[in-house]
Structures are given as structure tokens and as C-alpha cells.
Regions:
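N-terminal export signals
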Residues: 7-25
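Boundary/entry segment of secreted carbohydrate-active catalytic domains
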Residues: 26-54
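Active-site groove signature of glycoside hydrolases
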Residues: 109-153
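Glycoside hydrolase catalytic-domain groove-lining segments
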Residues: 186-253
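Aromatic-rich peripheral "rim/lid" segments of glycoside hydrolase catalytic domains that contact
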Residues: 287-338
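Catalytic domains of carbohydrate-active enzymes, especially glycoside hydrolases
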Residues: 48-70
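Aromatic-lined carbohydrate-recognition surfaces of secreted/lumenal glycan-active proteins
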Residues: 157-183, 223-225, 286-287
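N-terminal secretory signal peptides
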Residues: 1-3
Length: 338
């Protein structure tokens, strides 16, 4: 059994009626933000500052979720974002590391978050991205092993309880966790419910009720990740849309005959944001602002941007120029957030 991002919340629709009151009209989301991944080959302060200014002043975001494993980069981006007036949230990542290293890095980021009065997520989908909760050498093997590891939620919650205790001793701001839809998190000790919730063919009819059901925990809800790639049919694949690249080729190529279509991404984000507004979430973070190693190319077989979630497209000369251009989805987000 392979667990993909498109796996839906188990029992969400059934729980909706019992625990959540439908929100009838759109409400303005307080925390309107973008994911900003600090893991990249090119990291230049002027480029980062330009990106973050665009997030604040062109997209009209109120928040930013910083992802990464480099404390210096996370700190630099957070300081720039704070100066621009964004509410910073950190999501420290130590993929494929064990509990000790993961916890140490969360604590290190917690010190920075305390100084900057930021928010903190304790990680991303740790059952597949952290070593030790589920058997496997990487996230693919661990995802496949979920079905044969019945106590993985207990293991996850034990780790999160330890992390909460550790972080609360040095950090006094809001804490959440960026959960996978297959994870059953004990949210009692958290300030907010966080979930990476993509829409795809398996949950497009229940997406609104899945979001609404999250209110059963009686805490503010943050959609920590959602987004769509940039080709026809990507809206049906949701978080798995990136998997159309043949990495065995040199250079890598797009598999099959996919057709670039920015309208698909824009429409998907528009529809999901509308759901988030109507269901009264506290925060939503679009994934992702920029993917610098996935440049746009006119040749569709080489157009790595097609397989990316970013709302801006970079060009092959990015390392030298920092040049990017907004996609249609960029303007869609602006209309929702301004």
C-alpha cells in the first residue's frame, strides 16, 4: 500500500456534522501566506529580499511559512520578512534524520522564533520524513510501510509530546505541526491545528467538508500546504503532481505528453482559497512561491517549471540574474489576499 498526499482525511466527512458548524459566507482569513523554501542551490540575500518584498507587497500576504534545514538561511529570511511586516512561521526540516537530531534542530529554531516573536511548526509529515517512527530508509519506503506499522500514530504523538515539552521551555509563541492527512495527531497541547491538505481527484467532492471537519478540535485551523502544478490534469493529482519527470535522462525530461497550462494552477488555487475562506480557517499557506531549480523552458520536454508548484517561473539564467515572472496563479492569489 502506498500512502500519497492525495490520501483523504479518514472519517472527516462523517465527523463534520457532529463537530463542525458550516460557515455560510466567505470570511477574511487572518493569516494569508506563502510557503517559502530555503533549500536551494542559489541563496543570495538580494534575491531573497526581492522575493519576500513581492510576497508582502504584491501578493499582499500577511504571513510566510519558512521551510528548511539551514539555521542561517531560516534566520536571514525571517529577519527580512519580519522587517517587511510579515508574520513569520518556521517549519524546521531535518529529513531522514532521527529523533535526537530532529529535536535538537527544532529547539535551535525555537530560540530564533522566540527572539523574532514568530510561530513554530514542529515539522512536516514526520511519519514519512523522519527516521525512526516508521521503518524505511527514505520517505518512499516509509510511506509504503505505514500500512504494516499500526502504531505509527502513537509513535508520532510520543515524539510530538516530547518536542512540545522541550520547545515550551524556551519558546512562548504559537505552536502547530504540519501534519499529513494519514496522521492522527493529538492536538491537545498545540495552539493550532495544522495540516498539509491538497485537493485531488480522490477528495475533490469532499474537500470543503474535510476542511470544515478540522474545526472539531476546537482550535484555530491552519492549512500549512496546498497547491498545484502547472499542466493539464495537475489539478486531479494535487500534491503528487510533481511526479512527471524522468530523472534517468540527462538532462531530465518531462514524461509523456503533458501540456503546460497556467490556468489549471490558477483555477485550483482560486477554488481552494474560496473553500478556506468559506470554512473559516485561521491561516492558509500556498505551496510554493519559487522553485529555483525548476526553470521554465519553451521546449515542453525540458520545462521543469511545468512540474513545479511555484507561483512564479524562473528562467535558465536565474543564478546570474535572479529573474522570475509571475504565473497566472500569482494574480489569483493577489485578488484573494489584497
Amino acid at each position: 500500500m502506498t500512502i500519497e498526499r492525495r490520501t483523504v482525511l479518514v472519517g472527516a466527512a462523517a465527523l463534520t456534522a457532529a463537530y463542525a458548524t458550516p460557515v455560510q459566507a466567505s470570511t477574511r482569513i487572518p493569516l494569508r501566506g506563502m510557503n517559502y523554501d530555503t533549500e536551494r542551490e542559489v541563496w543570495l540575500t538580494p534575491y531573497v529580499r526581492h522575493d519576500i518584498k513581492a510576497i508582502r507587497h504584491q501578493l499582499h500576504c500577511t504571513g510566510i511559512l519558512l521551510l528548511g534545514s539551514d539555521l542561517h538561511r531560516l534566520t536571514e529570511a525571517a529577519e527580512i520578512a519580519t522587517a517587511e511586516g510579515l508574520k513569520v512561521w518556521f517549519e524546521p526540516r531535518q529529513f531522514d534524520k532521527g529523533a535526537r537530531e530532529t529535536l535538537a534542530f527544532i529547539k535551535a529554531v525555537g530560540h530564533v522564533a522566540e527572539r523574532l516573536k514568530a510561530g513554530l511548526s514542529l515539522g512536516c509529515e514526520l511519519t514519512i520524513f523522519m527516521d525512526g517512527l516508521v521503518p524505511g530508509k527514505n520517505y518512499i519506503e516509509r510511506a509504503q510501510a505505514l500500512a504494516t506499522t499500526p502504531d505509527y500514530n502513537q509513535r508520532l504523538n510520543n515524539f510530538l509530546a516530547t518536542a512540545l515539552t522541550t520547545v515550551r521551555s524556551i519558546f512562548h509563541g504559537p505552536i502547530t505541526y504540519s501534519s499529513g492527512v494519514w496522521e492522527d495527531v493529538a492536538w491537545q497541547g498545540f495552539d493550532m491545528v495544522g495540516i498539509d491538505l491538497y485537493r485531488d481527484s480522490s477528495n475533490e467532492k469532499t474537500y470543503a467538508s474535510d476542511v470544515r471537519a478540522l474545526h472539531r478540535h476546537r482550535k484555530p485551523v491552519i492549512i500549512t500546504e496546498f497547491g498545484c502544478c502547472t499542466y493539464r490534469g495537475a489539478d486531479k493529482r494535487g500534491g503528487d503532481g510533481f511526479d512527471i519527470i524522468d530523472w534517468t535522462k540527462n538532462p531530465p525530461v518531462i514524461k509523456g505528453h503533458h501540456v503546460r497550462d497556467e490556468r489549471v494552477q490558477a483555477r485550483y488555487i482560486d477554488e481552494c482559497l474560496t473553500v478556506h475562506e468559506r470554512q473559516g480557517v485561521h491561516g492558509t499557506f500556498v505551496y510554493n512561491f519559487i522553485e529555483t531549480e525548476s526553470p521554465y523552458m519553451r521546449n515542453p520536454k525540458l520545462d521543469m517549471d511545468m512540474a513545479g508548484f511555484s507561483v512564479v517561473k524562473v528562467f535558465p539564467d536565474y543564478a546570474r540574474t535572479g529573474r522570475w515572472a509571475p504565473k497566472l496563479s500569482f494574480h489569483t492569489i493577489t485578488q484573494h489576499f489584497k
